[in-house]
Amino acid sequence: MSLQRSEKEAVISEVSRLVAKAQTLVLAEYRGITVADMTKLRVQARSNGVRLSVLKNTLARRAVAGSAFDVLAGQMTGPLIYGFSEDAVAAAKVVAEFAKTNDKLVIRAGAFAGKALDVNGVKQLASIPSKEVLLAQLCGLLMSPISRTAVVLSALAAKKGEGEGVGQAQAVPA
């Protein structure tokens, strides 16, 4: 069943809107995957802010034309699922994690910052911690010297407080 021209234009418009917001696009072949597994993948993706779509490749190529993801146009062949995410690593992370447990989902390619990524590039991108984790690690690094200084000063104050009480005479209750 083919789509009417107006339906095709609506799909291209919707995908173009996703492409405009996305930082990352991941392509994965889903040949032979069960509906139950695909549903699990979609739920996992949705909870991580990733939009998964099964699209006609010609419509997808038209939607990415002139965008940073145009570098993937030549690889848009066969049964593909397209993962779009506004977070730089979310799409790669969701697809790569799911592909580890389900061999029917095969990562084909990806794009980030206008550069095409091969399978290994997508896996490397997936191994990078999320923005929130990186910010937490940075805060921990920035707070570490301050906390160490506070601990040292506290220990010095405690030691000095103990030293003051040694030479003083204590009053004996009558």
Curated annotation (Swiss-Prot):
One GO biological process term: translation
GO molecular function list: large ribosomal subunit rRNA binding; structural constituent of ribosome
Record's keyword terms, sorted: Ribonucleoprotein, Ribosomal protein, RNA-binding, rRNA-binding
CDD domains: Ribosomal_L10
GO CC annotation terms, alphabetical: large ribosomal subunit
Entries under InterPro entries matching the protein: Ribosomal_uL10, Ribosomal_uL10-like_sf, Ribosomal_uL10_bac, Ribosomal_uL10_bac_type, Ribosomal_uL10_CS_bac
Family: Belongs to the universal ribosomal protein uL10 family.
NCBIfam families: PRK00099.1-1 (NF000955)
Protein task: Forms part of the ribosomal stalk, playing a central role in the interaction of the ribosome with GTP-bound translation factors.
Protein's UniProt name: Large ribosomal subunit protein uL10
Native species: Verminephrobacter eiseniae (strain EF01-2)
Taxonomic lineage: Bacteria, Pseudomonadati, Pseudomonadota, Betaproteobacteria, Burkholderiales
